[in-house]
Amino acid sequence: THVFNRGYGSGRQLGYKYAVRKGYRYVIQMDADGQHDVCNILRIYKELQTEDENGALPDIVLGSRFMEGSSEFPVSFAKKIAFVWFRIMLKTGTGRRITDPTTGLQGLNWRTFRFYSKYNNFDDKYPDANMLMQMLLLGFRVREIPAVMHVRTTGVSMHSGLKPVLYMFRMTFSILAVWIREKILKMDEDKIRELEKYNE
């Protein structure tokens, strides 16, 4: 555990390191505010083990609030703008359309969380759409499924008020930096080759 609060991203990365140390095959993560229904856990777990038409398994499964079959979920106007903008950036940068680029409901296989556990591979502040840009450009297979969500009944979102606007600007620069790093500078290709040395 961390002896003091090091932030959202650092907390998640600590969980990935724990999963690597324990030899887990999958990690399923969800927000701690009660908005993600526990029924999503089994759905994501099954999807991680489901091959596509080409016989490939996903590396990352996203629980989407905006796919057909998802439960209705109210979103503020500011957040809607951010979602649309991040979708455009991901589509432009990777060719993939992701309906919910900031979802915290995700399932990861061992390749993904082992990669995330390494230094400088994971944003220790706000790992969201920027991580999807990175993983898609590195060739990780990302799949989305509809999710069951609940409206927050207590507490305050870390993206409340004007925070979504500030977050949108910060994430935009982070996504651009990731695109340059992976698409132009190709800085992480050696890390992927190293990752392939591991067997399940």
Regions found by a protein language model. Give the residues of each.
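Terminal low-complexity segments of carbohydrate-biosynthetic enzymes
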Residues: 170-200
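Catalytic donor-sugar/metal-binding loop of nucleotide-sugar-dependent glycosyltransferases
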Residues: 96-97, 120-123, 132-150
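Acceptor/aglycone-binding surface of glycosyltransferases and processive sugar-polymer synthases
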Residues: 3-22, 26, 38-125, 152-162, ...
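DNA-recognition element of transcription regulators
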Residues: 129
